[in-house]
């Protein structure tokens, strides 16, 4: 994605964030630009600070004070359960959890991130590849199916499938399995209740 397109998207949202990935020595080894559900790698560029980000995106100087700029720190560490914290100019911190699992989407390995609005952001995946609406107020339903020994996570909007995410079982941790089980149980409950309502209406 070209930086100009990224800039236009970020300016429409009036927000942007930086993801810093550090090694065990604390050195920044990679950085990403994040806006809503879009995450773009900034490979080959010098380390960018939050103060430099609006200038990089060509935001007019007189409009920069109205922008929401966040910083996300990721600690490589042991590679186990990781947590991210968004630090912003607002009072308090907004937690964002990097779920302890990796997924294979369109032959690309990704990791889902759950933020304060419970929106899953997929690292290294284009927004249109997931086809999940930006409107966090719209209901989402999750269902799980097994295929060739692997688990497929279906993201539903009503009765329409919005995304199919196949998990890489070799990377799934116990915590991730518990998370998937919770989704399965919730999806089953929704289906059961919907079936009861439909049968009641039929009578």
Which functions belong to the PLM regions below?
Residues 33-38, 55-203:
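C-terminal functional regions that serve as terminal interaction/effector modules
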């Amino acid at each position: 994605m070209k930086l100009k397109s990224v800039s236009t998207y970020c300016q429409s949202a009036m927000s942007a964030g930086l993801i810093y990935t550090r090694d065990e020595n604390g050195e920044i080894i990679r950085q990403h630009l994040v806006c809503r559900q879009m995450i773009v790698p900034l490979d080959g560029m010098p380390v960018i600070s939050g103060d430099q980000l609006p200038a990089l995106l060509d935001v007019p100087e007189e409009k920069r004070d109205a922008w929401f700029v966040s910083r996300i720190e990721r600690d490589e560490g042991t590679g186990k359960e990781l947590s991210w914290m968004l630090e912003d100019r607002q009072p308090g911190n907004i937690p964002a959890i990097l779920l302890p699992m990796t997924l294979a989407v369109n032959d690309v390995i990704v990791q889902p991130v759950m933020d304060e609005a419970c929106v899953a952001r997929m690292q290294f995946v284009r927004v249109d590849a997931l086809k999940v609406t930006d409107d966090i107020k719209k209901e989402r339903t999750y269902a799980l199916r097994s295929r060739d020994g692997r688990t497929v996570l279906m993201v539903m909007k009503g009765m329409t499938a919005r995304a199919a995410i196949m998990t890489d079982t070799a990377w799934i941790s116990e915590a991730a399995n518990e998370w998937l089980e919770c989704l399965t149980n919730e999806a089953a409950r929704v289906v059961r209740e919907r079936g009861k309502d439909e049968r009641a209406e039929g009578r």
